[in-house]
Structure formats: C-alpha cells, structure tokens
Amino acid sequence: MNSFLNRIYRYLIPSALLILFAAGNGIAQENLKSAEKIPYKQFLDNIEQQLPELRKNRIQVEKAKNTLYGAGSAEDVNLSAESAYSKTDVFSQGASLEKKDFSSKIGLTKKIAQTGTEISTGAGYNRTEYEAEGSAAYHYPSLYVKFNQSLLKNAFGIVDRYAVNDAKMQYDIQKLREIETDKTDINYYKKLYFTWIEYREELKLLNSYITGAKQIEETVKSRFKSGMVNSADLYSASAIVLKYQVAYEVLNTDMNALRTELNIFFKDKNIIPDDDEFPAFYTTSMTSEYQGIPFDRTRNAEIFRLTKNNLKYTADVSENKLLPQLDLVGEYTKKSADVSFSKSTENLNSTDYYLGFSFTHPLQNTESRSKLDETKLAIDEINSEYSISDNSYKKSLGAIISNHKDAERILALREKRIEILNAKYRFELQKYQQSQLDLQTVIDTAIEVTNERISVIQLKKQIIENYIDYSDLTEMP
C-alpha cells in the first residue's frame, strides 16, 4: 500500500510543478467585461487635454502672440487736440489795450515704420480781439501737413520696425519651444502607458505562479501527513507560495500608485490599457533604424538658430541707435485771416511752408552702447549654449543607440537563458522523480525561470522607452 501511495505522490508533485512551470507560459484571465480598453493614442489625447503643464505652455505662446499684436501700435493713427485761452495787456500809442486770444487745433499723426517717416495733418483756428472802442475780432483758420523723415538713426525705419520684427521672431521661437516643452512634459506619460501594461503582465504572471505554487503546497501537505516527505519539502512548498504572494503585493502597491496617478485624468473610470499596444510598439522599437541624426537638423537646433538671428538683428538695431538723430523736416500750411469768420474760411489763400534739418546726438549715449554690448555678449552666450546642447545631444543620442544595441544582445541572452533553465528544470524534475534531488532545488529553478521571464518583460519595456526617447530627441521641425 505504501509503495502504491509513494508512486501516486511522486506523480502528483511533478505534475503540480509542471502546472507551476506551465503557468508562467500563459496569462491568467481577468474579468474585464466591465472595463473600458483605452488605446495608446486616446490615452495620450486625454492626458494632453488636461495636463496643466501643457496649458501653461500654450499660454506662453498666446502671450507672445499678444505681444506681436501690441508691437504694431507704433503705426497706430494718433488723434490730438488742444485748446487755449489767453489775455494779454498790450500798449499801443501810449494806451493800454487788453488782447484776448482763443486758439484750438486738432490733428492726426501717423508713423510709417517701413520708411521711418512721421506725417501729421490737421486744422487750426485762432481768434484774436482787442478791447477798444470800434475794435473787431480777427479769425485765423488754417490747414497744415508736416513730416519728419529720419536719415541716420532710424533711417528707413530700422528702429521703428524693430518692435514688430522682434515680436514676430519671439513668437516663432515660442511656438517651437511649446512643441519641445510639450514633448518633454508628455514623455513621462508615453512611458507610463507601457509601464501600466508591464505591471499588468507581471501581476498576471505572478498570479498564475501563485496558483501553481498553492497546488504544490497542497500536494506536499498531503504527502507530509502520510509521512512520505520531510519537513524541508513542506517548508519549501509554503515558502514559494509566500515568496510569490509578497512579490505580487509589492508590485500591486506600485500598480495602485499608478492607478491613483491616472485617476487625476480619468476620474475613477474603469479603464485598462490595450495590451496589444505593447507587442506592436515593441516590434516597431526593435525594427526601427536608430540613425545618428545631426543636432543641426533637430527642432532644438532650429530654436537656437532663430534665437541667434534675433540677437544679431537686435545688435544691428542697437548699432543704428548709436548714430546721430538727423531728420529732414518740413511743413506746408494754408491759412487766411478776416474779421468775418465765414469769410475767413471761404478761401485759404495764404501759404506758409518750411523745409529744414533737425540734428541731435547724445555725447555719451551710454544706454545704447550698453544695450549693444549686452546683445553681443548674449550672442556669445547663445553660441556657447549651442555647443553645450550639441555635445549633450550627441551624448544622449549615442547612449540611446548604444542602449538599443545592448538591449538586443541582452534580450537574446535572456531568452537563451530561459531555454537553458527550461532544460535544467526538466533534468532536475527527472532527478527529483528518481529521489536523487530535493524539492527545494527544483523550486529554485522554477523561481529563476519566473524572475527571468519578468526580466524579459521589463527589458522589452525599456526598449520601448528607449525608442520613445529617440523619437523625441531626434524630432525635426
């Protein structure tokens, strides 16, 4: 009878071990009927719509756009008006007379930034009267046009155009910076999606091993009660169950933290990732070419180029500001005078005009010189930053390409090791069946297989993350 039971238990334990080992090759099924499967793109779209960092980046672009809008105010038409009243005592032929003047003027001024020209036009009216017997009031209406044309400083509107051109450059730079900053902010969530799948796969794997380990434990307990195995096998069987349970709970803690983080964006929705995205993205990551794209072809390099061009342009304007202010000025006025207001406005038959030059030049011009020196230093600084970023890019790109090649080799070795461990397991199982090996040795090999399979899942996720970093780093404008 004992011989018969011994044969039965020898069959049961290897069968249970085979169940444990086979469980690692499959994935335990979950009840996912009520869960909504969310694809990778939909996941990112949802994050991008809510991520506050991205909203902040968009605000920076809107601020730059608003600055551009406001920069054109230099060419706005300005309306001006003035009115005055005065009383003066004048002496005429030994007598004192009271002179009263009323004057008003209204006009429009427009600056043409493309040429550095300022044009004003308007109308004026003066009324003068003397308080004396028989005196009358005189009316002086007038129309005028005058201009101011810069010849040295601000020649052809180089200074007037600066505000608009600088704002345009800053707007273009900010739009590129938004893309780069958005990419950096969303990079974490791209990887988080595949970490989510990784945790799920590992939890399923551990759950299936726990099921198999419990079957081993029950089989060994029965055999122990019959006195067919010693306490060591019983402890080993119980220990492997606890080992997998601890590993499961530790990983489940990480999964709960991940779900809590995602809950910020998905508001307690019962969602799961599309597990098919993992092998598809992994295949893309493995088959893509990791080219050594030069830094000057990337969007970051384009940002540097635009920034440098902006600084060079600023330096040119600053140099122009060091020139003297030499302007060609002129005015043309039509006017008339009459004691009758109606007659004075009927025919503006008198003409005044002048043409001349205006010259001003600060002897030190400290502010403009300081601005020019500051801009030249900024150009030197941006050149240094470009070189630093170029070196950093080359370092990062080299590491990514190297990591990809290394990961391919390591993955091949790990998969080969799983094959060897499988063979080792079968050999040890045979020895155990022949009572030439203890249960713990077989269990240790099963644990090695488990760890190696988990390492393969993690390595594949690292390959995906490496590809995401490569795509972000080398993205062109």
Predicted segments, located by residue:
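Bacterial N-terminal signal peptides
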Residues: I13-A22
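Small/polar, glycine/serine/threonine/aspartate-rich low-complexity segments that form flexible
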Residues: N31-S34, S83-Q149, P279-T283, D316, ...
